[in-house]
Amino acid sequence: MLFQGKSIRVVALPEAGVFELVFDREGEAINKLDDRTVNELRQATQALANEPSLRGVLVSSTKDVFIVGADITEFGAKFSLSAPEITAGVAHSNEVFVAFEDLPVPTVVAINGFALGGGLEMAVSASLRVMSTAAQVGVPEVKLGLFPGFGGTVRLSRLAGPALACEWVASGKPQKAAAALAAGVVNAVAEPEQLRQQALDLLARAMRGEVDWQAQQQRKRVPVALPEADLQAAFVTALQAQAEAQVRAPHQPAARMAIEMMHAAARCDRAGALALEAKAFGEVARTQAARAMVQ
């Protein structure tokens, strides 16, 4: 056992140098990314980084879901802080996902059930993802007057492109496996009973150099790879659609704020884009809409 917490453990698998990071929230039916779990992910990632034999990491869940998102019961206290204080807290948490993303080996997530909000944000920090045909992924934060704050807007823009990323963030709708695969958010889909083996097979191929996992990671560290005209067109379309939506819901600014921030972040590297996301999250968390919807 490389690491044992109350929400996460890291165990060695039979193949030398391969470890499994398991989300298994003690005494609960689901996994959530509460403060304890994020802190344990920090410790687990450090343990993996310090392991000299490390060659690859499988990420899985023992629950019927992968991770359903953050623990909204923690939001009240957090959102009573000032916007700069909220931003600082988000930035501190984001260090965990950056550290996991920057492990020097391939990482593959087996998405067995719902991966929502922070659950999807954790998954897209890995190199590669295999998704069960029975699973769904998404970023539903807009339904709480928010938007993703753990790097979701940054990584989705670079994996799926800004148009689809804006659509996912602004709608908050869960997406099935076929849609996630077509969007480029996951790399493969599998029947539930074959998910683990397909994830292990993909990890083995990545470790053998047959899958360029490093290129998959690098694209999330650089600005969005689109010609300027295409980039501008994507955001003009997204902002027009959101302007129409805001006529129907004028007191819910989260989607518009997210798209405007994603537009600015698209030409930034990872660090710059994450900083913009964290700053905007601090601002949206202090809006009347967010305070009303997370109560």
Predicted regions and their residues:
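Glycine- (often His-adjacent) and acidic-residue-rich active-site loop
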Residues: S61-V96, A115, K143-L146
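Hydrophobic, secondary-structure "cap" segments at the distal end of domains
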Residues: T153-A163
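Long amphipathic alpha-helix in the N-terminal Rossmann-like dinucleotide-binding domain
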Residues: A275, K279-R291
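Amphipathic alpha-helical segments at domain termini/boundaries
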Residues: M1-D24, A29, E121, S125, ...
